[in-house]
């Protein structure tokens, strides 16, 4: 028999002065998709009518300017002293501020803080709708259960994490005929530019917690740290059957497996009981892990909360037929999220005292673990790029991690370098200069700090054993058999010192160095006196030097760059450094240059003379090359990964501050191409087929005329395809045409295994040791040849024979961080290419095996891409 229609008004009696969402909206839950403004109107009206139970906090704005709010709901008694309760909870979160006895006393009387996060993915619409019914029920219901729950908890409701994505989705869907449950309906196929899952910049907001790159993430993180809840639920959709924890493996070691298993079982059983009352189906311990700290559930768990992902089984459309023919609706998906949220809140309130006590213990364990763990702290050398060091510090601070800086030099007796050369990591005596960053792991956020900073976060032996067993089984299967998927849900490496390309050590010394708190961005600058010199030198010892050059070019000023080292007026001109000559620029140069240099923290060195005593290369040399203003096109629309496009968009607009033109693939033809001198292909698929021979030929001709063709990840590896032939590089393990006599010959399991071992097994995402050619323009600005390079997937590149392999993987000891397949990955990856430049006529084909802009995560690779954009259109073969 079909189930009865779910009743959202089952928790009677309700306070009559609180308006129902349906009364404010003009329709019932699930009848249509609500817009942001409709939700905003509804929530604020409920809050205004229930001021004794609800307070509203403005926590930020989205990229497109939509307000982000947090609604705090509790009993009238608690709400009257909410500020004091929050202060007490923050004190509870820092075991250094009170004794165990004081913490135990607080835990006996304090409410539990429970955060319910809605609509992080904008097209997972059941979560967005359920927020209104959750707030209404908590604000209006007068049942003993709800009143008792509010007396023992403070509920924090974030009604929409990603309003910009949700608005795109809603406006598109509401403009169509909706509600058809059959088949592959139009509403399921959002146009490329809509895809409401992502925010304005098409970032996946549930992968942004490490980078903290988007304003929505930053606002939510700051609010979380201002409240420090004990429970955090992140609502998602849509899966076949509703999911709530316990999680599958792997679980991040710093999450404390037993602690998280105990509490996710408590909440899982509470959710199960609520669902069982209605006969609803659900799953646990499948697919959704708790390993990658970029997820909301992992990040909040590592911060001390019980962080959980809930996945509902409908939303995104009004109705669908399941595989067995039964019907499920948006209203059902809303109801499932609504009931799970209430069950979790009620369970937290009932278990309030133990929950608070265990929360304190988890936070305290970060301090006590550091006493016995050899890894006491992480020290990061200042290097030559203070802005990059400051950006890393800010990233940590946005995660609530305490960061300090050394005021004077100090020495560690037991320091472990992050990068070593063969064998086990060395333990050495190491001196550190003033200005080094220090992150003590003995701090309340120490567990999160450790997983973000440690060289690699281990996976359990049991999990690894299961993956290797699957691989062995897959190798032996015949071509008709289905292979097993591996259980990696996301990347396995993210260590921030590697990601930022900063030299780092972890130390064992029990006595910490003397430091001072870091409260301001690290951005010193050096400006010359008011005199107007004949030229300015901008040393390329920091990333922002290249950004300064780009912005000057963007504004129409003339900038040169040294292709070989030289001297002028007694000052060394390093390879790649920038020279801005006054007499070749308008008078406004001096003011604009000083403003930009101050903003970006870039020293300006005045050059009073072009004369050189010691070298043949000076300001008048042919090796000082004028740079062309990059006129950038980024391929967009179908075939292009939205997140790949979005990360490039964000990088160009927000990181570099330069303009670009999105261009459709089919528009890449002669007249349109001639407008640009840089074309970037983000990650995507099917490019050569979509372009066809005329399109590829037009692209090749454009490159030969001086264009820089940049391909990122799969947006570049298609250059190797037979139909493209834009590079001489080929793929490792590429299939060869079998001999005619072998075509129909059956293979033994051993032969199949041997053949498959010649191909890379797909990587979930790890970091590998690589070598950089610093004499090539792509290597300008780097202070060392050794580089850490990320890689995922099963595409490895053989070196090109017709250009420069600007970055190549090391010969041995390749794996630096994360997971690789023993006996396969390093054997096939050794000495292959990571970044290739193939001069073609007057232009360049630049192929990056991985995307430096991925999730705004690999900050240390930025210069590789900046150099391609900045120097690619200005370098002809032989300049290097």
PLM regions: where:
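Aromatic- and acidic-residue-enriched segments that line the glycan-binding/catalytic groove
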Residues: 167-183
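Structured alpha-helical segments in the cores of large, soluble enzyme domains
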Residues: 100-104, 183-195, 220, 231-235, ...
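Intrinsic-disorder/low-complexity accessory segments
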Residues: 1-125, 129, 133-154, 201, ...
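Short, solvent-exposed turn/loop segments enriched in Gly/Ser/Thr/Pro and often Arg
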Residues: 159-163, 173, 235-241, 715-716
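Short, conserved secondary-structure transition motifs
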Residues: 150-169
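Aromatic- and acidic-residue-enriched carbohydrate-binding clefts of CAZyme catalytic domains
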Residues: 185-203, 739, 744
């Amino acid at each position: 028999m079909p189930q009865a229609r779910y009743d959202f008004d089952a928790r009677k009696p309700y306070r009559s002065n609180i308006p129902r969402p349906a009364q404010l909206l003009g329709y019932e839950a699930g009848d249509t998709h609500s817009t942001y403004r409709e939700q905003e109107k509804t929530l604020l009206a409920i809050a205004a009518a229930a001021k004794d139970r609800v307070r509203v906090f403005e926590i930020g704005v989205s990229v497109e300017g939509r307000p982000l709010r947090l609604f705090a709901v509790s009993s009238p008694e608690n709400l009257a002293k909410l500020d004091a309760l929050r202060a007490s909870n923050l004190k509870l979160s820092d075991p250094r501020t009170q004794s165990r006895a004081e913490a135990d006393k607080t835990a006996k009387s304090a409410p539990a803080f429970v955060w319910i996060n809605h609509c992080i993915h904008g097209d997972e619409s059941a979560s967005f709708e359920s927020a209104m019914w959750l707030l209404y029920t908590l604000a209006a219901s007068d049942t003993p259960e709800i009143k008792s729950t509010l007396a023992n908890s403070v509920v924090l409701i974030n009604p929409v994490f990603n309003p910009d994505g949700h608005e795109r989705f809603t406006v598109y869907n509401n403009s169509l005929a909706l509600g058809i449950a059959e088949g592959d309906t139009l509403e399921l196929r959002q146009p490329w530019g809509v895809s409401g899952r992502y925010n304005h910049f098409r970032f996946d907001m549930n992968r942004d917690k490490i980078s903290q790159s988007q304003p929505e993430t930053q606002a939510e993180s700051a609010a979380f740290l201002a409240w420090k809840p004990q429970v955090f639920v992140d609502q998602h959709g849509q899966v076949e059957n509703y999911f709530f924890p316990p999680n599958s493996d792997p679980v991040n070691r710093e999450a404390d497996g037993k602690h998280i298993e105990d509490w996710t079982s408590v909440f899982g059983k509470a959710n199960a009981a609520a669902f069982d009352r209605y006969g609803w189906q659900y799953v646990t311990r499948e697919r959704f892990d708790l390993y990658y700290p970029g997820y909301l559930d992992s990040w909040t768990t590592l911060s001390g909360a019980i962080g959980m992902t809930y996945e509902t089984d409908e939303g995104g459309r009004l109705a669908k037929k399941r595989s067995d023919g039964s019907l499920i609706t948006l209203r059902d998906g809303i109801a499932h999220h609504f009931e799970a949220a209430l069950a979790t809140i009620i369970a937290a309130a009932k278990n309030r005292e133990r929950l608070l006590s265990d929360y304190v213990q988890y936070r305290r364990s970060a301090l006590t673990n550091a006493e016995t763990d050899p890894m006491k702290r992480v020290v990061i050398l200042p290097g030559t790029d203070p802005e990059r060091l400051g950006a890393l510090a800010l990233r940590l601070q946005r995660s609530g991690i305490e960061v300090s800086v050394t005021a004077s030099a100090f020495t560690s007796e037991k320091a472990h370098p992050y990068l070593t050369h063969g064998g086990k990591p060395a333990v050495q005596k190491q001196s550190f200069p003033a200005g080094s960053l220090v992150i003590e792991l003995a701090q309340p956020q120490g567990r999160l700090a450790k997983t973000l900073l440690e060289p690699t976060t281990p996976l359990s032996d049991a999990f690894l054993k299961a993956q290797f067993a699957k691989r062995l089984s897959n190798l032996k299967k015949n071509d008709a058999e289905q292979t097993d998927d591996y259980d990696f849900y996301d990347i396995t490496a993210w260590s921030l010192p590697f990601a930022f390309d900063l030299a780092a050590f972890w130390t064992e010394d029990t006595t910490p160095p003397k430091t001072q708190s870091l409260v301001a961005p690290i951005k010193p600058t050096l400006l010359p006196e008011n005199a107007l010199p004949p030229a300015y030198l901008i040393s390329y010892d920091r990333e922002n030097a290249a950004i300064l050059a780009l912005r000057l070019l963007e504004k129409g000023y003339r900038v040169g760059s040294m292709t070989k080292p030289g001297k002028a007026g007694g000052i060394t001109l390093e390879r790649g450094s920038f020279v801005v000559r006054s007499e070749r620029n308008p008078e406004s140069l001096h003011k604009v240059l000083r403003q930009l240099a101050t903003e970006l923290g870039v020293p300006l060195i005045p050059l009073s003379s072009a004369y050189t005593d010691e070298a043949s290369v000076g300001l008048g040399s042919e090796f000082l090359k004028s740079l062309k203003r990059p006129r950038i096109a980024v391929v967009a629309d179908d075939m292009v990964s939205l997140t790949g496009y979005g990360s490039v968009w964000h990088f160009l607009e927000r990181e570099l501050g330069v303009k670009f033109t999105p261009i459709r693939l089919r528009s890449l033809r002669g007249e349109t191409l001639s407008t640009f001198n840089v074309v970037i292909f983000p990650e995507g698929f099917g490019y050569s087929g979509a372009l066809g021979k005329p399109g590829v030929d037009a692209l090749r001709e454009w490159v030969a005329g001086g264009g820089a063709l940049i391909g990122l990840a799969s947006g570049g590896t298609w250059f190797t395809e037979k139909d493209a032939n834009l590079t001489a590089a080929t793929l490792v393990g590429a299939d060869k045409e079998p001999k005619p006599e072998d075509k129909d010959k059956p293979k033994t399991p051993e032969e199949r295994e041997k053949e498959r071992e010649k191909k890379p097994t797909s990587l979930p995402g790890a970091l590998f040791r690589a070598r950089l050619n610093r004499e090539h323009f792509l290597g300008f600005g780097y202070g060392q040849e050794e580089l850490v390079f990320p890689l995922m997937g099963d595409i490895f590149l053989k070196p090109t024979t017709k250009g420069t392999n600007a970055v190549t993987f090391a010969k041995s000891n390749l794996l630096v961080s994360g997971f690789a397949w023993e006996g396969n990955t390093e054997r096939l990856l050794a000495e292959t290419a990571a970044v290739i430049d193939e001069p073609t006529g007057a232009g360049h084909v630049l192929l990056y095996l991985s995307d430096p802009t991925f999730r705004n995560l690999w900050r240390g690779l930025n210069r590789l891409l900046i150099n391609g954009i900045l120097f690619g259109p200005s370098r002809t073969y032989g300049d290097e």
